[in-house]
């Protein structure tokens, strides 16, 4: 009951005309900080773990820090098609991010705007990885899946969009 009320309030906060620019500016600043954090954390773990690829540092029973290059898409799908995969996924990811950049301009509610922003920031960070390294660096290892902060941003943004469109549209 309380969760439904919170979701209802979040879905109905408008990007009002009076403070629209301010809300968008704060979201952009926050999103830029998330992008920088993701890139810095990846850079740290790339340099820290580069001498021991394949070795995972156990933090908790099902939580490890691993050194994994993902040349494909989620869960390593198409990982073995490196030659054409990186360029293909770089182009596809860029097109998707640009489409979402268009959608964010149409956002009427703050939740919708911020959800799109998370997906854009996550996608952009993974595009930067592909441009710099030819693959996406994943390091957060939770039981059976390995991902990075950018993937988490995309996941959370997508969940927020599902919530938004489930309750509002």
UniProtKB/Swiss-Prot annotation:
Q: List residues traversing the bilayer.
A: 26-46, 55-75, 84-104, 117-137, 142-162
Topology relative to the membrane, per the entry?
Multi-pass membrane protein
Q: Name one GO molecular function term.
A: aspartic-type endopeptidase activity
The UniProt catalytic activity note for this protein reads:
Release of signal peptides from bacterial membrane prolipoproteins. Hydrolyzes -Xaa-Yaa-Zaa-|-(S,diacylglyceryl)Cys-, in which Xaa is hydrophobic (preferably Leu), and Yaa (Ala or Ser) and Zaa (Gly or Ala) have small, neutral side chains
Q: Known Pfam families for this protein?
A: Peptidase_A8 (PF01252)
Pathway-wise, it operates in: Protein modification; lipoprotein biosynthesis (signal peptide cleavage)
Quote the catalytic residue positions. 138, 151
Question: Which top-level enzyme class is recorded in the Swiss-Prot or TrEMBL entry?
Answer: hydrolase
List keywords of the entry alphabetically. Answer: Aspartyl protease, Cell inner membrane, Cell membrane, Hydrolase, Membrane, Protease, Transmembrane, Transmembrane helix
Subcellular location per the Swiss-Prot or TrEMBL entry: Cell inner membrane
One of the GO biological process terms: proteolysis
Q: What is its EC number?
A: 3.4.23.36
GO cellular component terms, A-Z? plasma membrane
> PANTHER family from the entry?
LIPOPROTEIN SIGNAL PEPTIDASE
Family to which the UniProt record says this protein belongs? Belongs to the peptidase A8 family.
In UniProt terms, what function does this protein have?
This protein specifically catalyzes the removal of signal peptides from prolipoproteins.
What is the protein's given name?
Lipoprotein signal peptidase
Biological source species:
Orientia tsutsugamushi (strain Boryong)
Lineage in the entry?
Bacteria, Pseudomonadati, Pseudomonadota, Alphaproteobacteria, Rickettsiales
